[in-house]
């Protein structure tokens, strides 16, 4: 008989713009369902922060979905009291376009990004790039080797806002066309996977995971010509996601 496992409640927040949120939600639920004792509630925004923080674990895949500033203290308290948060891809993104059509991050959500530890700024055109493993002692990155993101993903250029434990990183590969912050130092390292302690709790942020289909650029475009699968179909991505789901439930207070 297998050892009894304590039930853990998970809040999954999946919503936002310019990504195939349905696909990400489906895949994330699949990874969570591999652990029968994880019971998941799905949210599309952070509006019900009390409900979200009633769980022991939080998983987010969002873009342009952030908490109201008045709700951030509840999220911080969730972490300080031992909660774990797996934050994926656009979770650190809040975007708008200026009069020239270039993307930038408006103000107003500094407390949220400071808590998360980073803020997305830009990315170069989607293309393959190498991810470098910088910490082989963490349970998520243990024994991993550097790998290529075949097929490409969004290489996030980010502003780091806190001390974090960087597990994997990538090097800037060129200008971020279409963004206000266009020019970045060639070869500058940007975290791809990091861990941040918050009180008794912890955040694991993973920038990989872009996904876009034909109808995911509305209302800017009625139909987006090409599909962008991102890293989701890479075996190494599935491995890291499964390890992240194990990390999510370990050490929960």
Q: Model regions: which residues?
A:
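Short aromatic-enriched loop/helix-cap "lid" or pocket-rim segments at secondary-structure transitions
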Residues: 23-25, 97-101, 179, 216-219
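Short, solvent-exposed loop/turn segments at secondary-structure junctions
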Residues: 17-18, 48, 65, 92-94, ...
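A glycine-rich, often tryptophan-bearing local segment used as a flexible ligand/cofactor-contacting loop or short
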Residues: 66-143
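Helical hinge/lid and interdomain linker segments adjacent to catalytic or ligand-binding clefts
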Residues: 2, 9-13, 17-97
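Extracellular ligand-binding/catalytic regions of CAZymes and related secreted enzymes
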Residues: 2-8, 34, 182-192, 197-253
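Stable alpha-helical elements in mature extracytoplasmic
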Residues: 24, 71, 136, 237-241
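Catalytic beta-strand/loop cores that center a nucleophilic Ser/Cys/Thr
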Residues: 33-37, 41, 53, 118-211
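A general structural signal marking secondary-structure boundaries and capping sites
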Residues: 82, 144, 248-252
């Amino acid at each position: 008989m297998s050892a009894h496992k304590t039930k853990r409640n998970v809040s999954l927040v999946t919503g936002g713009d310019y990504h195939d949120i349905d696909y990400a939600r489906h895949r994330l639920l699949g990874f969570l369902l591999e652990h029968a004792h994880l019971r998941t509630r799905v949210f599309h925004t952070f509006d019900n922060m009390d409900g979200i923080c009633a769980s022991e674990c939080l998983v987010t895949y969002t873009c342009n979905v952030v908490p109201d500033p008045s709700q951030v203290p509840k999220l911080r308290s969730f972490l300080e009291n031992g909660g774990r948060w797996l934050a994926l891809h656009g979770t650190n993104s809040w975007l708008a376009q200026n009069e020239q059509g270039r993307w930038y991050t408006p103000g107003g959500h500094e407390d949220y990004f400071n808590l998360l530890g980073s803020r997305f700024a830009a990315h170069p055109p989607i293309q393959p790039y190498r991810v470098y493993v910088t910490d082989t002692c963490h349970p998520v990155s243990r024994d991993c080797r550097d790998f290529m993101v075949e097929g490409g993903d969004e290489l996030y250029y980010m502003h780091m806002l806190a001390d974090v434990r960087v597990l994997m990183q990538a090097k800037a590969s060129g200008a971020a066309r279409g963004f206000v912050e266009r020019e970045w130092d060639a070869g500058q390292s940007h975290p791809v996977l990091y861990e941040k302690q918050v009180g008794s709790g912890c955040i694991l942020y993973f920038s990989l995971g872009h996904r876009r289909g034909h109808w995911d650029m509305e209302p800017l475009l009625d139909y987006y010509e090409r599909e962008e699968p991102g890293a989701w179909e890479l075996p190494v991505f599935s491995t890291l996601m499964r390890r992240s789901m194990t990390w999510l439930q370990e050490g929960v207070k």
